[in-house]
Amino acid sequence: MPFKISRQAYAETYGPTKGDRIRLADTDLILEVEQDHTHYGDEVKFGGGKVIRDGMGQSQQSRDNGVVDTVITNALILDWWGIVKADIGIKDGKISGIGKAGNPDTQEGVNIIVGASTEAIAGEGSIITAGAIDSHIHFICPQQIETALASGVTTMLGGGTGPATGTNATTCTPGAFHISRMLQSAEGFPVNLGFFGKGNATNKAALEEQVRAGACGLKLHEDWGTTPACIDSCLSVADQLDVQVCIHTDTLNEAGFVEDTIKAIKGRTIHTFHTEGAGGGHAPDIIKICGESNVIPSSTNPTRPFTLNTLEEHLDMLMVCHHLDPKIPEDVAFAESRIRRETIAAEDILHDLGAFSIIASDSQAMGRVGEVISRTFQTAHKMKVQRGALPEDNQRNDNHRLKRYISKVTINPAIAHGISAHVGSVEVGKLADLVLWKPGFFGIKPDLVVKGGCIAWAQMGDANASIPTPQPVHGRPMFSSFGKAISPTCLTFLSENAIDAGVPERLKLERTCAPVKDTRKISKQSMKLNDARPKIEVDPQTYEVFANGELLTCEPAESLPLAQRYLLL
């Protein structure tokens, strides 16, 4: 006779199972478990009197015979491909199995072998996501990296050299000298890193040398002059050397309008930053570019989501970041031209429709590096409140919406920048960059951040206490964030051309250097659950935005979840 147990008791012991629903933090978003790959009555769990003991759930096999290094038991995975309950096996820093863990000598259906060489992380009651990817980083100060890691970001792509005036405004690491120094600096940080060279040049040789020096992409920024000639030159080099191009277009429309930029791009793949326009870009209608099939549009988090405070805070941020003078009327007019209620409101809806594919931070250059994930799910919450369930969802859950929004900060930036073979999702063979969340803190405070198979960050209590949990509990770096443990658990992304040219050896880099690949063969259709291409029109007088003829508008939020309730200091 099988033993029967109530759903509540089961969830409290092994975590939720198929059909169970979970509210995410203080949002109105409801997740429902779609599948459970663990076997009822044969679940593995660690602890006194529990299953993972020698001869029971722990096998006699050696590591050489397939035993994993780490098992995360009874994890609830939220990823673009599904919402499933499973055990996760990690070996050599990569995800080696998703399914049923245990001892094949005593249990059936085991595809993750637990042995004496296996560490256990209790995933019961936790939600697991892939480490987030922030693809719009101004590397202004190194302290950003700890803040990002503490929020669940494990990969940072962008440009900069520190608090230089150019870096404060643009995500560019210009030239071989600066690229080399940043690659060497990356050795000391416990996240994956990649650096963009400056793409503003009509002389292709000036761009090629940056890619060959180790840039993983090129960035076109209006503060350096994003002219049609520069756009064409930069994309030509990118096509030749297989790196992505990111663009911040011409707010002032000095060298042309959005139609001229589209013409200069010539149908080639490009990642458009802050495509709504408040972060910069052709005023007032850069947003229409999100309907192009070759354009991968992203947002930065200062406009995520639209709130009562969004417009007011932007003006001062703009003046500081772009080295503008409030005493000069033209500078003030430039800043004001970028801040439009109508396009910011439309941006919320375009994200919900899956027309905007990525959300990133714009760190310290109008964006907040530690709020990429929280702003993403604040937007999802606001859209559910204002627009109701998506057509793909029902009254029981918001699964499709959740998968759409998690994709914006994980798999889609990975695909866009040619690194999805390594990171961006919870899939076998990828780097074990995983974030564990307690449901009550989902999106705002990770419980554990696993980096390359080792714990890099965790909520931890008083180090002098007799157990790990006494107050004050707060996020702290863990062992793999220190010393030589960083090198085998983190990747540095370079162009394949730079790796073939021996840049890692010449710079004596110890971290694994991985090439970006296939950035030029992708399109909007490559974006998971975010590939909609509506025809966008903007009224030049009122700034109203229309998608396929329908007006896109919504009210600003007066309050938000994932905010001050969790952040008292």
From Swiss-Prot:
Family matches, as PROSITE patterns: UREASE_1, UREASE_2, UREASE_3
Keywords for the protein's UniProt record, in alphabetical order: Cytoplasm, Hydrolase, Metal-binding, Nickel
Binding positions (Ni(2+) 2): K219, H248, H274
Cofactor(s) the protein needs: Ni cation
GO molecular function: nickel cation binding; urease activity
PANTHER family, per the entry: UREASE
Protein name: Urease subunit alpha
Origin species: Prochlorococcus marinus (strain NATL1A)
